[in-house]
Design a protein with these regions (language model features):
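Short, glycine-biased loop/turn motifs at secondary-structure junctions and
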Residues: 1-211
Length: 211
C-alpha cells in the first residue's frame, strides 16, 4: 500500500488532541477506525511544511507517512494510519524563520519603521535568553502600533504586520503569522515559494544537526 510522505506539527507535549491523548513517538504508527474525513476524523498531515504550519498547534515538527484510506484536500490530507519517522523540536527554528520572513517584508518597504526593526532584534535576543518576556511584549506592542500607523499604506502595513507577528512568544504562531503577512502584499506565489524553500532548508539542517 502506497505511503504518502507528509509533515505534521504536533503539540509540545507530543500528545494527540481532541481527547485522544496518545503519544506521538518516532517509529510509532497511530491509526484510527472508520473512514477518514478531513478536519473531522483521521491521521492528518500536509505535503509541504508551510501548509502543515498553517494547522500547527505546537512546535514539534514531525516527518510522517500516511496511508490506508486517504482523504485529500488542497493543503492537507488524512488517512487511516500515520507513522512518525522522526521528530525535531522546532521552537527556536520557527522563531528564526518568523524573523527572516519579517525581514523580507521590511526589505520591500521604504523607510522601515524603527519599532518594527526593533521587534525583530528583541525577538532574537529573547530566544537567546538575553531579553525578558516583558521586553518582548513591549516590542510587540510597539510593532503593533507601527502596523496601525501604517494601515493606510497597504505595502507598508504588510511589513509592519510581519514584524509584529515575528514578536509573538509562541514559535508556531509567530512563524505562521509572519509568513502570511510577509506574502500578503508581495508577489504572493513567489514569496510563498521562497518561504517554503527556506523553511524546508532550515528543518533539513536542524534534523541533520540533531542526528
Amino acid at each position: 500500500m502506497k505511503r504518502i510522505l507528509c509533515w505534521h506539527f504536533a503539540a509540545d507535549d507530543l500528545k494527540l488532541g481532541y481527547r485522544d491523548g496518545r503519544k506521538i513517538q518516532a517509529g510509532r504508527i497511530l491509526s484510527v477506525e472508520g473512514t477518514p474525513e478531513l478536519c473531522l476524523h483521521g491521521m492528518h498531515g500536509s505535503r509541504t511544511l508551510l501548509n502543515a504550519l498553517d494547522y500547527a498547534n505546537g512546535s514539534q515538527i514531525c516527518r510522517c507517512e500516511v496511508w490506508g484510506q486517504v482523504d485529500k484536500g488542497s493543503a492537507k490530507l488524512c488517512g487511516t494510519h500515520r507513522k512518525t519517522l522522526w521528530i525535531i523540536d522546532g521552537t527556536n527554528l520557527l522563531h528564526e524563520f518568523a524573523c527572516r520572513c519579517a525581514e523580507d517584508a521590511l526589505a520591500l518597504a521604504d523607510n522601515p519603521d524603527s519599532r518594527s526593526v526593533r521587534a525583530i532584534e528583541v525577538k532574537r535576543l529573547w530566544v537567546r535568553g538575553l531579553a525578558t518576556r516583558t521586553e518582548l511584549a513591549a516590542a510587540w506592542d510597539a510593532a503593533r502600533d507601527a502596523a496601525w500607523d501604517a494601515a493606510r499604506a497597504a505595502a507598508r502595513a504588510a511589513a509592519w504586520d510581519a514584524a509584529r507577528a515575528a514578536a509573538w512568544d509562541a514559535a508556531w504562531n509567530a512563524a505562521r503569522d509572519a509568513a502570511w503577512a510577509a506574502a500578503r502584499d508581495a508577489a504572493r506565489d513567489a514569496a510563498w515559494a521562497v518561504q517554503s524553500r527556506r523553511l524546508a532548508a532550515m528543518v533539513s539542517a536542524e534534523h541533520k544537526r540533531a542526528k
